[in-house]
Structure formats: structure tokens, C-alpha cells
């Protein structure tokens, strides 16, 4: 600081704002605290400013500046930004519903992907869109899973389709395919597409006449 000017990376600017972002002569944005000083992070990442918002700061003190709401990837992590450059984060890992889609945001502010276990329930966050998979059957690592409207994996349950096709999802939530399985008192057969087989089938070199209680 010299005569009210702040010097950052060889540039200087008189700063009259506080608790806000400002653009310096080097073209980068910085956060000016309520006391009028430039916020200096201990390293790159999400920090909560004294205006209550969280921003992504680089180690040199500059802020990731955005003008459009949406997901932006920085390095190997993705973040959901508001149009004022703040990051959607509470400082705790949580689900956040944004524009009709649900995301899982970590305590450090980045979007989580893959399997998420909460209590006894499991959810899956898309590695492509980052959103939670809901109300559909989808393939994950070679297995098909059935997700309800809240995104929870459905386990140990029959699924009916088109009034006649039956599928079964085991205790891990995986759809049974190309196998036989004892469910309750009965043994059932499923083809490579997971459809429950009826009547006469060929399985492991033998012909089987199927009779089971499902109607």
C-alpha cells in the first residue's frame, strides 16, 4: 500500500470499494475486505468473504470471475457459480437443487460425482452433467440400476415394464441379467437383457419348463 494505492503483480489502483470484487489494472479481479485490504488466501480454493459469499481464490489473491450462472471446471474440480462470481456452497457437504436438477456439493465447494452414500441410501451423481440420476434406469460400471424420483437406488424389488416384462434388482441395486436367482421360495431365470423368462427356455445346456407365481 502506498498513498492509498494497492500494488498487485506490478500494477496499482486506487481502491474505494469494500466487501466487494474489483478489477485491477492487470485485468484480474480481487476481493476488497470491509477494512479496505485485498483478501489474501493461504492457497487456491473456496473461501468465505466478509460479505457472506464464497468465491474461488487463486493463490495470488485473484478471484475466478464469471458473469453467467453455471458449472465451470477449474483444474480437475467443477464448481457451480452464480452470475456474481460467488460459488454455490455452504461449507458443508449437501444436496442443492438448481434449475430443476440436484447436485451434491462438497464441504470444499466442488461438485461431487459417482456414488454417494447417505445413511442406508445410495445415490449416483453423473460424471458428465454432475446432476443426480433420478426416476430412471441407467448403466453404471456395466450394471443397470433403478433410481426412484428422489435419486435413491431401489434394491431387492421387481420392476414391471409394458405390462408383461419383469426385471429384478438385487440387494445391491443391480439388475439381474443372464442368470438364475432364488427370490423368496422360488428360482427365477433372467435373459441377457434382464427380462424374466417364462415357459420353455434353454439354460446351461438344459431345457427348462418354467412355472412361477408371478402373474
Predicted regions and their residues:
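Extracellular adhesion/carbohydrate-binding repeat motifs centered on closely spaced tryptophans
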Residues: 1-215
